[in-house]
């Protein structure tokens, strides 16, 4: 027992427990986020006697007489300052880390009211952010310090909400102050908790499951096994190959497979009951790698399949082999890139509520409410009216929240028990369960003429897609179609294979396969420049695709093509670095916006004038931290002339908001932005006729947009693979004395920057994320197909480790005739970073590396 104060109130805690559990579960102080409960991520900082402390570490019995402050306990003035400063700086994206950042900032500013940039970065060194790259959070802390010193709030730099305005994100306040709801922040009277009993072996036949002892444990509400599933057993994003539960007689695919589900009155009882479920296995040989999967006579991950090949792609145009043979310079190299964990700050969580009609409503944190509805309704065997989905705030995704993780399990337990159920993954479960970035092995050959003009590229790639298909096929396809790079040449051939293994599944990850193959193409191009005797910048400028040119996939690019402009944007900094003798590396990239390759790609939006006389925006598109809600409000303001205060953005749901597809593929700004613009045209016509919003109450204005493209391999001279591409050039400059990165420059063609503040934040965040991919991040898997990393050992960059400068250059190239010319930027920001960094280190050391993460750098673990 201990007595202490929390936000000025004296409390006595009888039961010894972690402080975070008391603050969240008893006091419901939701600014204290539970990101890992391992003392690693830093989302749970509170002030204890003025010192920022992770609340997941101290036990309440050790806090006698202490003074604890959370964001809820800040003064009104402090809340105003941090909300304004973080909004003005663009510091907020998914928001899950932000209240803890505020606490760390307060801990600094209370003792140092005028910190340097380095001191601010050091103060948040124990707070991980996966979205922003820290630059704008540090900006926000320094701005807050300035406001506190001066004693008054300045006016915002922009408030007109037109497209192109640097307005504060619409969700800044609820994220800064911690009252915005993520699923784990929801507490319902009588709510139960769920958990999964997972396989002890990556590949084994389940011989029996005995749940009797677990069912008899006091506090257990129900235990579910496969026989309790009323509908279809399998779920899956594209291919339904992922069992909701493994049944008796079936073979497990990886250690994350579930064999039973527990529903109980509290999490402690769930954990106790899981240990009482008895499962008997026949252990079988596991497949650890694509090489093992491809070996003659290899066991099949899926019984009944002809082989372990999950996907095969072949992309060809012209005569690559002939062109390479006739080239003056030819380079061939083998490359490999590793598994990568998304490491979003918010672990997967879903709250399932029983509906009066016998169905369920799911409060989720995923990348498509409608996809969740489709999969869970089929599993429950109910129609869509009996399986409703509402998105809460989403604490980061990056592709890792496209698949089922907890939603179907929460839905099943709620459906069976008729009780509200919260189902949340522990951080270790999250690291095991959700799909990762594919590990790739790649062989590339490039031929150039004496002037450095690419003549042909031939390649083969192999990916480990793990236990399930997830999005392995589309990732492989995108890796292959983009492997040619953003250059104007004709002869290209690539063959790709994705193999099932018993490793954790791999699926969507920021860059969607292009990150891996771009590393190869750009590294060879840098090496080729040295052979030809020209600069890496010059070889790209000579080969760069220009408006009206033809990409290696045959698509004729339009006037919005801005690769040359990105190269020109970084040229002064590149020349200055070369002149000063600093080691500098460069790389380019392109990335599609939208699904493309002939797959129907719909954006949909509904504008409803509600009883409050305001226009409410409804779209099934998930806002996962990229700022989609702000974008759509800016689109409505621009295209209707309405004031910002007349517009309300509603989070996606499945019973009002029309399906607008997944938040994936850098697509939502373009496809849902255009759908919203079309809905605005209809509303604007009514307003122009003299009607007021009051007169339009109850009316709906619907817009949809279909991004039409041609299938891969379409028999047309110049297929349209994608409706739009973004282009980028990034540059890495090293400190030649220390060998550390002193500056990253990233120039990105975005068409129209709807909110330049958000665009810059996306660029900075993508750069830092792929600095980790290039230099430090690792996801080791042992001989039992078990990932061995914890959150704190993944190699994520921290605020005091980023370069002194990350320069984001926003290039706006007109020409795209949809969505006001805006092209999504979520993925491309992370694509060219690794090859640019690798080339910079070659310029420093004289040694090229063809595998990631790089080993010959100051960032590599000491051997």
Regions from the language model: what does each represent?
Residues 90, 165, 171-177, 307-350, ...:
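Glycine-rich loop/linker segments at domain edges
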Residues 397-418, 422-423, 628, 634-635:
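Thiamine diphosphate
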């Amino acid at each position: 027992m201990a007595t202490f104060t929390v936000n000025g109130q004296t409390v006595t805690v009888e039961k010894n427990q972690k402080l975070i559990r008391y603050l969240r579960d008893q006091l419901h102080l939701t600014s204290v986020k539970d990101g890992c409960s391992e003392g690693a991520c830093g989302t749970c900082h509170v002030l204890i006697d003025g010192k920022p402390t992770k609340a997941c570490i101290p036990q309440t019995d050790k806090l006698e007489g202490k003074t604890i402050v959370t964001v809820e306990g800040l003064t009104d003035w402090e809340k105003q300052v941090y909300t304004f400063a973080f909004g003005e700086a663009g510091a907020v994206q998914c928001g899950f880390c932000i209240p803890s950042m505020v606490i760390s900032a307060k801990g600094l500013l209370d003792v140092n009211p005028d910190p340097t940039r380095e001191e601010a970065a050091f103060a948040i060194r124990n707070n991980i952010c996966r979205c922003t790259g820290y630059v704008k959070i540090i900006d926000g802390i320094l701005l807050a310090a300035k406001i506190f010193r001066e004693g008054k709030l300045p006016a915002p730099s922009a408030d007109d909400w037109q497209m192109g305005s640097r307005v504060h994100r619409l969700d800044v306040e609820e994220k800064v102050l911690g009252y915005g709801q993520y699923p784990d922040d929801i507490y319902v009277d009588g709510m139960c908790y769920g958990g999964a009993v997972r396989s002890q072996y990556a590949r084994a036949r389940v011989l029996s499951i005995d749940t009797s002892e677990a069912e008899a444990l006091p506090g257990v509400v129900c235990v579910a096994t496969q026989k309790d599933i009323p509908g279809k057993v399998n779920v899956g994003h594209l291919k339904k190959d992922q069992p909701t539960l493994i049944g008796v007689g079936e073979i497990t695919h990886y250690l994350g497979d579930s064999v039973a589900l527990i529903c109980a009155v509290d999490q402690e009882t769930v954990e106790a009951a899981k240990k009482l479920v008895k499962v008997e296995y026949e252990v079988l040989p596991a497949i650890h790698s694509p090489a093992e999967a491809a070996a003659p006579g290899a066991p099949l991950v899926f019984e009944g399949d002809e082989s372990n090949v999950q996907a095969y792609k072949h992309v060809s145009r012209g005569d690559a082999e002939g062109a390479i043979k006739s080239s003056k310079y030819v380079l061939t190299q083998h490359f490999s890139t590793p598994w990568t964990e998304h490491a979003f700050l918010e672990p997967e969580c879903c709250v399932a509520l029983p509906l009066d009609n016998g169905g369920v409503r799911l409060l989720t944190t995923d990348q498509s409410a409608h996809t969740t509805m489709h999969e869970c309704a089929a599993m429950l065997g109910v129609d869509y009216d009996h399986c409703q989905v509402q998105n809460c705030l989403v604490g980061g995704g990056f592709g890792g929240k496209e698949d089922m993780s907890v939603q179907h399990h929460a839905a099943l337990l709620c459906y069976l028990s008729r009780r509200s159920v919260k189902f949340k993954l522990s951080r270790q479960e999250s690291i095991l369960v959700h799909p990762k970035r594919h590990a790739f092995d790649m062989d590339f050959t490039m031929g150039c003429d004496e002037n450095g003009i690419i003549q042909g590229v031939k390649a083969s790639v192999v990916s480990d897609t793990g236990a399930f298909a997830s999005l392995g096929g589309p990732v492989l396809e995108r890796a292959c179609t983009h492997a040619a790079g953003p250059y104007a040449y004709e002869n290209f051939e690539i063959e790709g294979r994705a193999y099932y293994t018993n490793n954790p599944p791999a699926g969507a990850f920021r860059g969607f396969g292009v990150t891996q193959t771009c590393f190869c193409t750009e590294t060879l191009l840098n090496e080729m420049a040295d052979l030809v005797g020209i600069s890496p910048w010059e070889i790209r400028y000579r080969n760069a695709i220009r408006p009206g040119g033809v990409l290696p996939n045959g698509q004729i690019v339009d006037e919005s093509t801005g690769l040359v402009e990105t190269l020109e944007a970084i040229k002064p900094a590149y020349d200055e670095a070369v002149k000063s003798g600093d080691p500098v590396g460069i790389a380019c990239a392109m990335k599609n916006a939208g699904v493309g390759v002939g797959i129907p790609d719909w954006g949909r939006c509904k504008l409803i004038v509600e009883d409050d006389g305001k226009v409410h925006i409804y779209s099934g598109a998930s806002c996962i931290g990229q700022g989609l809600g702000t974008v759509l409000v800016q689109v409505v303001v621009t295209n209707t002339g309405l004031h910002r205060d007349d517009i309300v953005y509603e989070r996606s749901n499945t019973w009002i908001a029309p399906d607008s597809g997944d938040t994936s593929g850098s697509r939502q700004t373009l496809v849902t932005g255009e759908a919203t613009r079309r809905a605005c045209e209809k509303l604007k016509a009514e307003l122009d006729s003299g009607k007021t919003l009051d007169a339009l109450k109850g009316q709906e204005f619907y817009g949809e947009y279909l991004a039409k493209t041609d299938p891969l391999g379409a028999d047309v001279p110049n297929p349209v693979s994608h409706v739009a591409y973004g282009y980028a050039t990034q540059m890495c400059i090293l400190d030649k004395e220390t060998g550390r990165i002193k500056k990253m420059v990233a120039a990105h063609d975005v068409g129209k920057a709807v909110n330049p503040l958000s665009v810059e934040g996306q660029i900075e965040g993508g750069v830092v994320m792929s600095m980790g991919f290039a230099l430090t991040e690792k996801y080791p898997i042992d001989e039992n197909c078990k990932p061995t990393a914890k959150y704190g050992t993944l190699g994520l960059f921290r605020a005091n480790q980023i370069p002194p400068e990350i320069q984001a250059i926003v290039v706006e190239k007109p020409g795209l005739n949809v969505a006001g010319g805006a092209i999504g930027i979520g993925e491309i920001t992370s694509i060219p970073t690794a090859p640019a960094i690798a080339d910079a280190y070659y310029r420093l050391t004289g040694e090229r590396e063809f595998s990631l993460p790089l080993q010959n750098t100051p960032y590599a673990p000491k051997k």
